[in-house]
């Protein structure tokens, strides 16, 4: 499910639950990394993370907040319900409102995002880099600390006033 679909799901669930004012921030990421030692795979890791922080304002304009990693329809409804329950305990001395900048576009330098190459390709590239480094000078006997990783992430903010902001990036890191 992409961030627009999640926003639609939250909006529909909020309407169903009769919640008029809400917002959410989300972070989604996929990370892959490899390490080698003398050409042998030492560590291979892949992870996928998704987290939503949802705020709900009750009819007294008190705010409740909850966090979930369940982005299914039932998970989103449950999170909205929990945030609504939490709003009963909101601070009466503080009134939180949407930022007037929430609908402003995010100015991001456009950079080509890459698709994941995957663990096998990362492992092959790192093995080749280790061999080249070992062969580059006779005094280099081993490369005990090395790694190659790639990360892909998206950050999202949306609210019941129609704001939707999103930022995504991919990056790779090599250390030898």
Question: What residue spans do the PLM features occupy?
Answer:
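Active-site bordering "gate/hinge" segments
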Residues: 1-176
